[in-house]
């Protein structure tokens, strides 16, 4: 029992700190750069990824004993594509504005490498509970970084967070922060910060 | 031969079964949500049209559908809506699209009842550079179209945006996006106007 609890704890902590996707694994970088101009789309994107990650982990974990090694990537992609399509339809039906903002980046979750990485690394080797926990914690870790990056960019590019004005009116918006260059600069600085914090810990 | 088929199924049965199950899942979800997705689209177009023609218009009816030629051999489906208020025609609105700076731009354009004057346009979808090209959605650029003649528009780099005429003053630093909107409106407006006159839906006076 104690061993099991340990595995759960390890899985959760891995997603949230030790293997946090963007800082440690350096996976899922494309949406990180593309949809972080404002917090709301970033959060929507993060929640969609959590949904897809958990569902595909469950599907892969359930069929892990039936997988043929040379067909496994095909099966992962099949499961991921299904849940991404569902997430995309959901956003179109219930969050049409967000769907318009995110545009092609929702279907592109299919090729988000965190999801296939977790299918391969965790779900195809572990039971259902560990897979679900892994999906949740990896997704949450990714979403937290995404929202953090997006709030810095939204604050500097528009003076708002979640569309609410927080900077004084005298603040001159830095338009560059909402463009790709802002994403690269902010991400680079955050990665540097993350690495220097990580070094002190070990 | 038989062995080969057996081998094939041994290897791939899971893939076949899973494809079927996942396909079914998508089909069910799509069937459940597609009416809502369609409704969202109509609602969005309706909202834009109301904003462009208010307070004159009370309701919109889809009157005609037309394939507008974008370039040689390339067509886009256009819906033409008739705006009614107090039982009379208050104007027309239609969707239009074309190439922008980074991606295609989709617009809703509204004109008055005789196709004499443009009443305005709005963006359904665009992906122009933030801070530069995306100012096509904002005044003063956008306001130049309200009241402009429904004929051939021309983009100029210097001028007074307050003057409402067929000359549209470009946004400085975003000439390509400014030109794109003018081109899209020119292209679809002229074709639609011709079509409407041929069908007798509007007078030939314009």
Per-region residue spans from a language model:
Chain B
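Flexible, solvent-exposed loop/hinge segments and secondary-structure transition points
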Residues: 2-206
